[in-house]
Amino acid sequence: MPLVPKRVKHRREFRGKMRGAAKGGKYIAFGEYGLEALESHWITNRQIEAARVAMTRYMKRGGKVWIRIFPQKSYTAKGVGVRMGSGKGAPAGWVAVVKREKILFEIGGVSEEVAREALRLASTKLPIKTKFVTRSSEVGGESNEG
């Protein structure tokens, strides 16, 4: 089941700015281990789903995964070969606006080695640099550029 909003007030949105760090969602709230964004970027619903599948396949049937981001912003695209003007394009997909320091995914109920590898596999599906964090080391954490 794809991650899309059930209904929206406006089909087309402005692009917006991604200045600064995240205001909320900076700390692990549910699991023991998390994946923190080191850059700001749009992350599509397909990228989120690919990361989720990569994590759950590696963990087999152990543990629990929490997705802390949701793609609630629509983006538009005009057809190939269409000239400039004539209005905004049709909605093409959904993205989550992710700012740096935001926790993207959380894992609980597995060992640290399993969680570290599962989140590393998930990070390869995302277009940003990420970092593995634990509940005990909220401030620091080991860097996992990839």
Swiss-Prot record:
GO CC terms, sorted: cytosolic large ribosomal subunit
Gene3D superfamilies the UniProt entry points to: Ribosomal protein L10e/L16
InterPro entries: Ribosomal_uL16 (IPR047873), Ribosomal_uL16_bact-type (IPR000114), Ribosomal_uL16_CS (IPR020798), Ribosomal_uL16_dom (IPR016180), Ribosomal_uL16_sf (IPR036920)
GO biological process: translation
Cysteine pairs bridged by disulfides in the record: none
PROSITE patterns, A to Z: RIBOSOMAL_L16_1, RIBOSOMAL_L16_2
MF (Gene Ontology): rRNA binding; structural constituent of ribosome; tRNA binding
Keywords: Ribonucleoprotein, Ribosomal protein, RNA-binding, rRNA-binding, tRNA-binding
Keyword Ribonucleoprotein found: yes
Pfam families xref list: Ribosomal_L16
Its job: Binds 23S rRNA and is also seen to make contacts with the A and possibly P site tRNAs.
Family: Belongs to the universal ribosomal protein uL16 family.
Subunit structure: Part of the 50S ribosomal subunit.
Protein name, per record: Large ribosomal subunit protein uL16
Organism of this sequence: Lactobacillus acidophilus (strain ATCC 700396 / NCK56 / N2 / NCFM)
